[in-house]
Amino acid sequence: MKIPSKFKLFGTTINVVWDNKRLNDQSVYGLYEYSTSEITLSTSQGVKELSKDRIIDTFYHERTHAILDMMNERGLSEDEKFVDVFSKLLRQAIESEEY
């Protein structure tokens, strides 16, 4: 799966950017910011490169935050266990599609 540079939710463009330094300074792999409609991702944790699988999981995790925030479901968006499980199920559903 390729990670998009942007996608839309309710007509709002969500940009996907890469910033290893910023996220390493915050000790996170990814971040969704509602105020800027932006997902920031990292490809490393310190000097260690993240696996492609970890990066894709992180993208789906942050995308789930974006979806829930756009739905005004802040409580669910703040529930990291829910977001983590839901994002993994969403990834599996999309990646296992057959046509």
Tell where the protein language model's regions lie, with residue ranges.
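Short, function-defining helix-loop hinge/capping sites that tune catalysis or transport
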Residues: 19, 69-73
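Short, surface-exposed, polar/charged, turn-prone segments marking secondary-structure boundaries
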Residues: 35-36, 42-46, 67-70, 86, ...
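Short pre-active-site segment immediately N-terminal to the catalytic Zn-binding motif
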Residues: 37-58, 73-74
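Post-HExxH zinc-binding segment in Zn-dependent metallohydrolases
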Residues: 73-99
